[in-house]
Amino acid sequence: MTSEAAPASTAVTYKRVMLKISGEALMGDQGYGLHPPTVQRIAREVQAVHRLGVEICMVIGGGNIFRGLQGSAQGMERTTADYMGMLATVMNALAMQAALESLGIFTRVISAIPMDQVCEPYIRRRAVRHLEKKRVCIFAAGTGNPYFTTDTAATLRANEMACQAIFKGTKVDGVYDKDPRKFADAKRYETVSYDECLQKHLGVMDASAIALARDNDLPIIVFSLDEPGGFCGILRGEGTYTRVQG
């Protein structure tokens, strides 16, 4: 396996980033599960950024397989439902690892819940070393605790890994004052503050994740994962997105 990176002279906005995507992003047009061509397409987007020399962390949700809140709403104990959701994120992480490694990118799946035969346990210093060696680190199983979302896990790991920004890949090209898929007059923000996101319930991330980013001055870049080259373009200073900051 080879792992190509761009020359050090390549101009990029950030040197180490966290990419957060939902589990639903992996299911394509299906209503459930994994759509291998979609997983491969996202992996190629990550590959393009990796070639710039950027160190990449990832967190992937599990909603395409199981969502803890939905299980809880249907009568399942919340803690059990959340653990099931965490296991779903491990499945998605392994699928993404396979896709990235098929493109020649060394990748490590790092789980907050130990499962040594499947992936590595989370050890912060080891994970940092993987990044320094230009390996993609996919953090799975959330924080390892129920009642915390993968958005919060992504923000926590981004801070622990000293990422310079969180990139939140979504279905739309930024943060809007209302759903642009339903309202033609929806306005996209170029920048928006953490507090405004919380006060107006703009749906960027859950409140705990936004507060954790705010308290550590960690910007959140919201962009469309469906836009070819969008992730790479933003790191080159191009593209359409919303920046959430103080």
Swiss-Prot record:
Pfam families: AA_kinase. Its EC number is 2.7.4.22. Belongs to the UMP kinase family. CDD domains: AAK_UMPK-PyrH-Ec. Homohexamer. This is Uridylate kinase. The gene is pyrH. NCBIfam families: pyrH_bact. Allosterically activated by GTP. Inhibited by UTP.
